Curated annotation (Swiss-Prot):
The lineage of its organism: Eukaryota, Metazoa, Chordata, Craniata, Vertebrata. InterPro entries: Apop_reg_BclX (IPR013279), Bcl-2-like_sf (IPR036834), Bcl-2_BH1-3 (IPR046371), Bcl-2_fam (IPR026298), Bcl2-like (IPR002475), Bcl2/BclX (IPR004725), Bcl2_BH1_motif_CS (IPR020717), Bcl2_BH2_motif_CS (IPR020726). A motif (BH3) lies at residues 86-100. Expressed in most tissues. Bcl-X(beta) is specifically expressed in cerebellum, heart, and thymus. In the ovary, the predominant form is Bcl-X(L), with a small but detectable level of Bcl-X(S). This is Bcl-2-like protein 1.
Length: 233
């Protein structure tokens, strides 16, 4: 599922950049085409020294890319729901998360004072704090939203080179640290069941449903994410 996870990261970051008037294609070729969408490139192994502070890039061979046959049993259940549905659910959940924390979210990445030389350390510290007490779907949404905001902040500050790096860091963390939990909790199918089909928009119309499952995870994730950021110098 590693390549599919990377596809989710690229799609989400592309979406967030487009909301600010930027195009993913402006930045996907910045560092040797390392962050192109997976359906356009063959899996590559990242050179550890190529990115400041970036851990080795692990791309497992996956028959799941682009609907290829020969799926392993661990992937079958998750592929029942099309990748497009997962992407859409992530976009909607990310928008809802940012809407709820718009005021704080507008400044959160600027608190890090990132530079190309310190960006990975900042990313790692914030993400480790976010998941320090465990993983849930709300925190996974916060993880994606943080990465998107960090990319936008990088471009705004003319550090476009960081966009491809952030995409790689996110995909690596997702594969190495979050994928086991995702598999154990129903896969992305479960995420789509909870957050898909415009659930974020519908939840604003029906507060009882919203408070029951969405707000709990999102609020905790928001508090953890914002707290970890604003507690930093």
């Amino acid at each position: 599922m590693s390549q599919s996870n990377r596809e989710l990261v690229v799609d989400f970051l592309s979406y967030k950049l487009s909301q600010k008037g930027y195009s993913w294609s402006q930045f996907s070729d910045v560092e040797e085409n390392r962050t192109e969408a997976p359906e356009e490139t063959e899996p590559e192994r990242e050179t550890p020294s190529a990115i400041n502070g970036n851990p080795s890039w692990h791309l497992a061979d996956s028959p799941a890319v682009n609907g290829a046959t020969g799926h392993s049993s661990s992937l079958d259940a998750r592929e029942v729901i099309p990748m497009a549905a997962v992407k859409q659910a992530l976009r909607e959940a990310g928008d809802e998360f940012e809407l709820r924390y718009r005021r704080a979210f507008s400044d959160l990445t600027s608190q890090l004072h990132i530079t190309p030389g310190t960006a990975y350390q900042s990313f790692e510290q914030v993400v480790n704090e976010l998941f320090r007490d465990g993983v849930n779907w709300g925190r996974i949404v916060a993880f994606f939203s943080f990465g998107g905001a960090l990319c936008v902040e990088s471009v705004d500050k003319e550090m476009q080179v960081l966009v491809s790096r952030i995409a790689s860091w996110m995909a690596t963390y997702l594969n190495d640290h979050l994928e086991p939990w995702i598999q154990e909790n129903g896969g992305w199918d479960t995420f789509v069941d909870l957050y898909g089909n415009n659930a974020a928009a519908e939840s604003r119309k029906g507060q009882e449903r919203f408070n029951r499952w969405f707000l709990t995870g999102m609020t905790v994730a928001g508090v953890v994410l914002l707290g970890s950021l604003f507690s930093r110098k």
